[in-house]
Amino acid sequence: KSFPKFNKNDFGLKKIESEIWNGFIFIRLNKGPQKSVKSLMSPFSEELGSYKIENMVPTDGIWTQKTEVNWKSVRDVDNEGYHVPMAHPSLQDLYGKNYFDEPFVNGTSKTHASFSGKTARNWSVKNYKKLSTPAAHLPDKYKNSWNYFGIFPNAVIAVTPETVQFYQEFPISTKLTLLRGGIYRHKNETRQQRIARYLSNRIDNHTVAEDVQLTIWSNESMNSKSFEGFYLSDLEYGVKSHHDHMRKQIPILKIEKQPDEHLIYKINKEML
């Protein structure tokens, strides 16, 4: 009552763009040229729709972790899987050679990994394979695999027979990155599914720790005074396709010699 008459709508919260897709809520603070998430992810709509993600519920909320590397080091490691046999013994035990990366095309990518038929040596993997119990609504072709769907530039949605999760990374500075994610389970989860989820989480935790170490080594190598650039092998097409997407959006990345910092915005704008 102490305020004079005025239009409250003029002083309300600012509107932002939002979209609900398969239960996930996406927001955009500023308008941009990107497609809707539904359109962007349309190549995988049938597959991801089979998991009924919108009916799943959170497990332990959102987790966060900071790592002292450039965010692009995190993304480069995550965008190729040929390091799995040497760097991730649990994943190698889970699916072995049954692992295939698809490159980024029009803003999305996919990695498919089906369980191997071999007896696992790792305790968590061995018991996970034994107890994995897919939901009744999941088609047979998705019941024995883990699949990862990349969304350019910095997000991944991963599905297993028991869970769906997202993870992403945000640059805090050129030397510090925030990792963030969440895991969701079936609403009417059985005891066996809960145990399988616990085991898959153990496998994931080991993998995350191993990947963090790889990003540290990668970041250290590029900060070395001896670093003079690199060549990508044919096995690193996932990394290359992500770099190609980056260069398209930020063309100044094509320049080999770093320009003066105060000129970066101007040069990049001229190259668009």
Label each PLM-derived region with a short phrase.
Residues 1-27:
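Short Fe-S-cluster ligation motifs
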Residues 19-272:
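C-terminal catalytic domain of Rieske-type non-heme iron oxygenases
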